[in-house]
Amino acid sequence: MAAKDVKFGDSARKKMLVGVNVLADAVKATLGPKGRNVVLAKSFGAPTITKDGVSVAKEIELKDAFENMGAQLVKEVASKANDAAGDGTTTATVLAQSIVNEGLKAVAAGMNPMDLKRGIDKATAAVVAELKNLSKPCADSKAIAQVGTISANSDSSIGEIIAEAMEKVGKEGVITVEEGSGLENELSVVEGMQFDRGYLSPYFVNKPDTMVAELEGPLLLLVDKKISTSRAAASTERASAGRPLLIVAEDVEGEALATLVVNNMRGIVKVAAVKAPGFGDRRKAMLQDIAVLTGGQVISEEIGVSLETATLEHLGNAKRVILSKENTTIIDGAGADTEIEARVKQIRAQIEETSSDYDREKLQERLAKLAGGVAVIKVGAGTEVEMKEKKARVEDALHATRAAVEEGVVPGGGVALVRALNAIVDLKGDNEDQNVGIALLRRAVESPLRQITANAGDEPSVVANKVKQGSGNFGYNAATGEYGDMIEMGILDPAKVTRSALQAAASIGGLMITTEAMIADAPSDAPAGGGMPDMGGMGGMGGMM
C-alpha cells in the first residue's frame, strides 16, 4: 500500500481553502449577464469557450493533492445543483465559497465547527421555506421565455424558441437539442408518436421524391417475435383484409420480407414493415405503448395469440403512418383516451419508483410520446466552437424552464435570496456558536448578488445595501445598470434552481467546515535520471573524419 500524507487542523483547512478559492474564482467569473468567458484547452482540437459554470468546474484539477480535495468538493456542489435542477451551478459555487471562507474564519477564531454547521443548516431550512413562499407559478409562454433567456446568458432567441417548443408539445413533451447545419436556431415538431426505426426495405417507399413510405388510414400489426416465413407473411396480409398495413415486429427477414416486398410492388396489398423500437423488456413495453395508442393488441404467444389466429380485432388503427430511412411516425392513433390516460399514469408511477437515471430518461421519452409530442431544437452557429458553447447554453436554458414550470419562479439577479433573508433576521440558535453559523449564512446569501454586480463592473456593497433597503421584487438589473421590479424587467429565476443551489452549497460547505484531518497519497520520490549509456567500442569513430 502506498504511503499516505496526513494533515490536521488549520494546516489541512488552509490547503483545502486554497483549492476551493481557485475553482470558485474561475467559475464565478461567468456569473450574471455581464459574466466573462472562460477558455478551456483540449488535448486535441480547438479550445472551447464557455460561460457554463459546471463545464469550467469539470476541467479543474490541481497539482497539490490537498488543494485538489478542496477543489473537488466544490466541484461536487456544482454537480449536485446541476443534477437537481440542471442549472444554478455558478450560484451554488459562489454560495459554497462564501460559506467555506466565512466558516473557516470562525473555526480559526475558536468556534465549535459542529455548532456552526447546525446554525448553517437551521438558517438554510428557513431560507428554503421562504423561497417557496416567494415563488409564483410559471404558466404563460412569456414567463417561460424570460426564464430561458436569463439562463442562456441573456440570449432572447434561445428563450423564445424554448417557449415556442413547450407551447407546441406541452409540459410533458420531450424537447431535444441537436447541432443544426445553418446559422439560425430552428425548431421542428413531430406530430404523433415517433420512434427511431425506419423501413426494412427501400422497396416499401411510395414517395420517391422524399424517399418515404406513407400509408393512409392503415391497420397496424404488432408482433413481439421475428416473422421469417412466407406463410407467416401471407397470414399478416390476410388479416388486413385489403387495407394498407404496417407491420411492427422484432424483425421481418428472408422469405417473409421478400413476399411482402413483391406483393407491395404488384399492388396486391399496400404494406410496409419496420423493426420494433427498443430492446428486451423495453421493446415489449414500447410495443404495448403503440398498441394502446392505436387501439390494437400485441400478437404474442404469451397471451395465446399467434399470427395464424390474428384477426381484424387484434390490429390497431391510425390516420396516417410515415416511414423514412431512420424514423417511423404514427399520426392520430385510434386508441381510447381512457386507456391512453391509464398507460400514462402507469409510466408516471414507474418514473417515481426508478432509481436509475437512464431508465428515468427512457420512461420520460415514452411518456412524452404518449402524452405530448417531440420537439427538436437545432442550434445554428457560425463555427464549431460557437456551436458547442451555444448548445450547452440551450441545454441549460431548457433545464431552467422545466424547473420553472415545476416549482414556479422568483425574482432573479440574486434578489430572491436577499428577500429570503427576512426569514432569518430574528432566527436564534441554541447557543452563540449556532448564532454565528446563522449570521454566516446571512452574509453568504448576498454573495450571488454581489458577484453579479462585481462582474458588471459596479460596486457590490452599494448595490447590495440599496437592494436590501427595497422590498418585494425590487432589485438591480446588471445588464442595464438600473434598479426596478425584476419580474417586470423579465429577470426571473426558477425557484427550484435557487433552492437546489443553496441546499447543495450549505451541505458541502458545512461538511468542509467540520473537516479536521485530510489524507492523501504521499508524493513519490522519482529516481534521478541516469546519464548516457556506455559508448564502448565506438572510440575509433574519430578516425572517420
UniProtKB/Swiss-Prot annotation:
It is found in: Cytoplasm. One of its GO terms (biological process) is protein refolding. GO terms for cellular component: cytoplasm. CDD domains: GroEL (cd03344). Keywords: ATP-binding, Chaperone, Cytoplasm, Isomerase, Nucleotide-binding. PROSITE patterns: CHAPERONINS_CPN60 (PS00296). InterPro entries: Chaperonin_Cpn60_CS (IPR018370), Cpn60/GroEL (IPR001844), Cpn60/GroEL/TCP-1 (IPR002423), GroEL-like_apical_dom_sf (IPR027409), GROEL-like_equatorial_sf (IPR027413), TCP-1-like_intermed_sf (IPR027410). ATP binds at residues 30-33, 51, 87-91, 413, 477-479, 493. One of its GO terms (molecular function) is unfolded protein binding. Its EC number is 5.6.1.7. It catalyses: ATP + H2O + a folded polypeptide = ADP + phosphate + an unfolded polypeptide. SUPFAM superfamilies: GroEL apical domain-like, GroEL equatorial domain-like, GroEL-intermediate domain like. It comes from the Bacteria. Together with its co-chaperonin GroES, plays an essential role in assisting protein folding. The GroEL-GroES system forms a nano-cage that allows encapsulation of the non-native substrate proteins and provides a physical environment optimized to promote and accelerate protein folding. Forms a cylinder of 14 subunits composed of two heptameric rings stacked back-to-back. Interacts with the co-chaperonin GroES. Belongs to the chaperonin (HSP60) family. This is Chaperonin GroEL. It comes from Pseudomonas putida (Arthrobacter siderocapsulatus).
